[in-house]
UniProtKB/Swiss-Prot annotation:
ATP binds at K11, F59, R87, T93, R104, N114. GO terms for molecular function: ATP binding; metal ion binding; nucleoside diphosphate kinase activity. HAMAP family: NDP_kinase (MF_00451). It is found in: Cytoplasm. This is Nucleoside diphosphate kinase. Signal peptide: none annotated. Pfam families: NDK. GO terms for biological process: CTP biosynthetic process; GTP biosynthetic process; UTP biosynthetic process. Its EC number is 2.7.4.6. It comes from Aeropyrum pernix (strain ATCC 700893 / DSM 11879 / JCM 9820 / NBRC 100138 / K1).
């Protein structure tokens, strides 16, 4: 097994609904480590950079509007196969199709307001991490 890092972001709808603790608890109960975490409000520029892979998609503008509509909580999660483990933990992007027991399956009925974002690959993590964090914010433990 390979120890990896991945990014997990509680989106504005998750923050507004008071689900930060729920998300953190699920990460910890799974045996993963949070090595960086902060609350922030993304600027339009940061949001566009963060979601740059979707720039040419029809939903890009709506996605940027939503992610900048309120605070988010971003965390770097570390553990064995962290990218795939966290993706399984959060469930399908479309909350209506996400399995019960997953974060989105338990708390979302929407494809946009789906509580959380998580990196979909180690390469995505590297790009997304550079937008939201610096290496000095990682706490080794």
């Amino acid at each position: 097994m390979a120890v990896q890092r991945t990014l997990l972001v509680v989106k504005p709808d998750g923050v507004e609904r008071g689900l930060i603790g729920e998300v953190v608890s699920r990460v910890e109960r799974k045996g993963l480590k949070i090595v960086a975490m902060k609350m922030m409000r993304l600027t339009r520029e940061k949001a566009e950079e963060f979601y740059s892979v979707h720039r040419d998609k029809p939903f890009f503008g709506e996605l940027v509007e939503f992610i900048t509509s309120g605070p988010v909580v971003a965390m770097v999660v570390e553990g064995d196969e962290a990218v795939s483990v966290v993706r399984l933990m959060i469930g399908s992007t479309d909350g209506r199709k996400a399995a019960p027991g997953t974060i989105r399956g338990d708390f979302s009925l929407d494809i946009m307001k789906n509580i959380v974002h998580a990196s979909d690959s180690p390469e995505s993590f590297e790009r997304e991490f550079r937008v939201l964090f610096s290496e000095s914010e990682i706490v080794e433990w």
